[in-house]
Amino acid sequence: MKKIIILTFFLFNVPVLSQSGQIEYVSFLKSDVTSYFNKELDNIVGENDSKISYSLIVNGNKSIFFSENTLSEKTNKINLQEINSKLIGTIFLDLKNKVFVQKKIVYGEELTIKDTIRNYAWELINNETKIIDNMLCYKAIHKEIIEKKIENEKNEIQVIKKEKIITAWYCPAININLGPLGFYGLPGLIIILEDDIFVYQAKKIKLNLNFKQKKLVEPPKAEKYLNNDEFKLEYNRLKSARENMMKN
């Protein structure tokens, strides 16, 4: 029987991180997703077996996560890695002051979100472990409900709800409770993070930072900041504008 512990990471109980460092991740599509796109949508979707590098820089209770490179090859086909990189953008967390800032590209527009960091209810599955690059890692999952609005054949808007599962493999030996994409709250560094499409895996871990690296851990600057609700409104506006443009 699986031994599962529910760990809800409350903002008022954020522990002080005892280490700083820079972790380099690579992202790639899950094999079943790659096979589907290459087989079913070959005419519009390009090769998606490429990888994009990301950096997570941690300085105490502050961290920043961003892409190190983009795919340079120009093509008329869709590259999911490139799109995902733009949607992620730059993510800044300040756990002590409960601040989340994310700057990203949405439908060609640069938007910056600034709001309170969210809570994650992790399920720690302590009897599932694996060795990743000589590190003993434990499994944890986070579940959330995603709502998506679609238009049916009668031109009616329907709301579809779907459970999304995030799987993390974390290493308690590394005293950094962060990971890719702004995820945090596990008792150790997230070495691998998986959603339904992408995998993010740590490839290089360097503990302790020099002065230049510490200076990078600052929130993205913007002329205008949106909270989460304002961002959703702006996102829907840009989406509608793009859809109307495609119809004309």
Question: Predicted segment positions?
Answer:
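Bacterial Sec-dependent N-terminal signal peptides
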Residues: 1-24
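Extended soluble regions of mature proteins
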Residues: 20-248
